A protein has these predicted regions:
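A short hydrophobic beta-strand element within the catalytic core of glycosyltransferases
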Residues: 287-288
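Carbohydrate-associated surface elements
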Residues: 179, 201
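Conserved donor-binding/catalytic core segment of Leloir-type glycosyltransferases
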Residues: 174, 205, 210-231, 237-241
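Aromatic "clamp/platform" in nucleotide-sugar-dependent glycosyltransferases that forms part
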Residues: 292
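Membrane-proximal helix-turn-helix segments that form the acceptor-binding/catalytic region
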Residues: 152-173
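Short hydrophobic beta-strand element within catalytic cores of glycosyltransferases
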Residues: 309-312, 322
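Conserved acidic donor-binding segment of nucleotide-sugar-dependent glycosyltransferases
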Residues: 271, 324-325, 329-336, 345-350
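Short alpha-helical donor nucleotide-sugar binding micro-motif in glycosyltransferases
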Residues: 272, 279-284
Length: 391
């Protein structure tokens, strides 16, 4: 049976959208939900947090989830410091139990929903009889394409099989970057006609504010990231020490984490508010993100929104966001010598910093705003719902 026309015909009861999420997703869930509401103003959007609404309210489900996670990933939890919260979403138990609970909860009201929509590909929120859409920044197997990614850090094939079900049950999949779209096709066999790259926007207020960086002469570098190792923090410290040998007044500000043993010229502030991130960006001369794994990198979009140049790794989504030699510099991951040279090239050239920052700002204003993302998602949903399922 084909899906209903979009928008619903007069008299149709399909006037709701179910929006499924897991936690905050670095504030992306808030921005995405705002766009779903803005782009579908005639629809009531019901938000549903699978963790808070399904797991935390059911002590037995939570206890069994922990037990299954420890049984499946016990050694990795202990030796690789794999976070329990991350591993629990990669167990067959929680995957199937969440899908059962979602279907049971919504079964009596299936007729009320025009479509369902989920962010991230960690669970399957599809409901039989309702068109389903996914918006994600990653696939798990995309990790295997990063240089030097340890094979023993990949989740087992049992999880990949479940992840593949998420994509099979979606009418259309929206992704933040082309490298994820490529992975969907090459690693999961998803036809390109069922995927769209829609990018993402900034998760902090980007209202224009004057920069306080002495015309890019204060030589302040900002790093933003919660996962110090994954974001290339140790490589950045090694590069920064090399940089300081030539540029002794260079300064490194670390936001999001608080590593120990920092050399002179470095300061770490740990987790800070979005407003504090904005203030630090306004005081910086550039952003550096020498990440080892990067599904998207919203921090780069936020830096460009503040007219800052960037130095980032040439992996994942980065080459699609940063134009080499125009808005920033791309370097290989885990290469402190190349990173130090790139930092030196920009931090000692205020005019180039300003020129790159303006180019990055123009690029994100055109392609990386939440309004642009919402418009692309709406267009994709409209086109999909006008096409019979399976056509």
């Amino acid at each position: 049976m084909s899906d209903p026309a979009f928008p619903p015909q007069a008299g149709s009861t399909r006037k709701k959208v179910a929006f499924f999420k897991q936690g905050a997703f670095s504030y992306t869930n808030v921005r995405t939900a705002e766009q779903i509401r803005a782009c579908f103003p005639g629809y009531e959007v019901e938000e549903f947090d699978v963790l808070g609404d399904m797991v935390h309210r059911r002590p037995l489900v939570r206890a069994l989830s922990i037990a299954h996670t420890v049984r499946l990933y016990g050694r990795r939890l202990l030796w690789q410091r794999l976070p329990l919260s991350q591993a629990s979403f990669r167990t067959p138990y929680l995957f199937h139990r969440l899908h059962e609970l979602i279907c049971e909860h919504f079964a009596p009201r299936v007729h009320e929903f025009a479509f369902t929509f989920q962010t991230q590909s960690l669970f399957d929120a599809s409901i039989p009889g309702v068109p389903h859409f996914v918006y994600t920044d990653h696939t798990h197997l995309a990790n295997a394409h990063y240089p030097g990614f340890p094979a023993d850090e990949l989740f087992p094939q049992s999880w990949v099989k479940l992840e593949r079900e998420i994509y099979q049950n979606a009418r259309h999949i929206f992704v933040m970057s082309d490298h994820v779209r490529t992975s969907l096709h090459d690693d999961y066999g998803v036809e390109n006609s069922r995927t769209s790259t829609v990018n993402a926007g900034s998760n902090i207020d980007t209202t224009p504010a004057p920069l306080e960086n002495d015309g890019f002469r204060n030589r302040t570098i900002v790093f933003i990231g919660l996962d110090w190792e994954r974001k290339g923090g140790p490589t950045l410290l090694a590069a920064f020490e090399r940089l300081r040998a030539d540029v002794p007044d260079a300064r490194l500000v670390i936001l999001g984490c608080q590593p120990a043993g920092l050399p002179p010229g470095c300061e770490a502030h740990g987790r800070v508010s979005r407003e504090e991130v904005k203030r630090w960006l306004a005081r910086a001369s550039l952003l550096c993100l020498p990440t080892r794994v990067e599904p998207f990198g919203i921090a780069v979009v936020e830096a460009f929104a503040h007219r800052l140049p960037v130095v980032v790794s040439n992996i994942g989504a980065m080459p699609g966001i940063v134009h080499q030699g125009e808005s920033g510099l791309l370097v290989p991951p885990d290469d402190p010598v190349a990173l130090a040279a790139a930092l030196r090239e920009l931090i000692t050239d205020p005019e180039k910093c300003q020129r790159f920052g303006e180019a990055g700002h123009a690029h994100v204003c055109k392609h990386y705003t939440w309004e642009a993302v919402g418009a692309k998602i709406r267009a994709g949903i409209e086109a999909t719902l006008r096409t019979p399922a399976g056509a």
